[in-house]
């Protein structure tokens, strides 16, 4: 009897392997051969699922973004205002090994997105979603009296996005120098400034 292959599961295994290779070896080290070996498949097994490396890399970024969004949804459930803002940001900031590895994936993705319209569009869509959500949390915090700053909610969302993405770069380049407590403290200090 022939073996039944779950193609969605196989794609996910390949994307997970890509994620691990990029985190370990960087974008240039993420060859189709390395990815296949990491996933435990023959090199040719990737082609039916991802005909090109760029498609696989784009899927890996999408996977990281989806994982982050799943964590954000879980951690912000039932929260509003500043508590929701803090929980959202804490899931993006590189506060543990998993999130540092995610930073190691998105940074080379940004480099590729500079010259690839599809990757740039994926990034733009992702950041637009985050900006919309952060702005809504800011508006809820302002309505609850938790934010008093005259800076508008969209501008606060810009600040928080820049802080989170910048922290990913800094920690990926020198993780030993930036402990999670420092980043969490910086976030708390910024949120305290918004109160007034």
Question: Where are each of the predicted segments found?
Answer:
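Hydrophobic/aromatic-rich alpha-helical bundle segments in the mid-to-C-terminal region
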Residues: 120-124, 128, 142-190, 194
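Amphipathic alpha-helical segments used for helix-helix packing
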Residues: 84, 97-120, 169
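A ubiquitous short alpha-helical element
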Residues: 55-56, 73, 89-96, 121-128, ...
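N-terminal intrinsically disordered/low-complexity leader segments
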Residues: 1-9, 150
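Short coil/turn segments at alpha/beta junctions that flank glycine-rich nucleotide-binding fingerprints
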Residues: 24-28, 99, 144
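Short, basic, alpha-helical segments at the C-terminal edge of helix-turn-helix-like DNA-binding modules
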Residues: 62-68
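Helix-turn-helix
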Residues: 13, 17-59
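Hydrophobic alpha-helical connector segments
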Residues: 59, 73-103, 153-160
């Amino acid at each position: 009897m022939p073996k039944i292959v779950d193609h969605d599961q196989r794609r996910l295994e390949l994307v997970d392997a890509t994620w691990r290779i990029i985190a370990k070896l960087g974008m240039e080290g993420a060859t189709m051969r390395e990815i296949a070996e990491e996933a435990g498949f023959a090199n040719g097994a990737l082609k039916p699922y991802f005909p090109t490396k760029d498609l696989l890399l784009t899927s890996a970024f999408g996977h990281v973004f989806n994982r982050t969004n799943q964590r954000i949804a879980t951690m912000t459930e039932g929260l509003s205002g500043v508590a929701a803002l803090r929980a959202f940001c804490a899931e993006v900031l590189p506060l543990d090994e998993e999130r540092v590895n995610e930073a190691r994936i998105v940074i080379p993705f940004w480099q590729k997105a500079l010259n690839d319209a599809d990757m740039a569009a994926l990034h733009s869509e992702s950041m637009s979603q985050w900006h919309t959500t952060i702005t809504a949390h800011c508006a809820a915090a302002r309505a609850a009296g938790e934010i008093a700053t005259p800076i508008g909610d969209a501008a606060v969302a810009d600040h928080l996005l820049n802080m989170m993405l910048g922290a990913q770069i800094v920690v990926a380049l020198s993780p030993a120098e930036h402990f999670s407590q420092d980043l969490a403290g910086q976030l708390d200090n910024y949120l305290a400034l918004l109160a007034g």
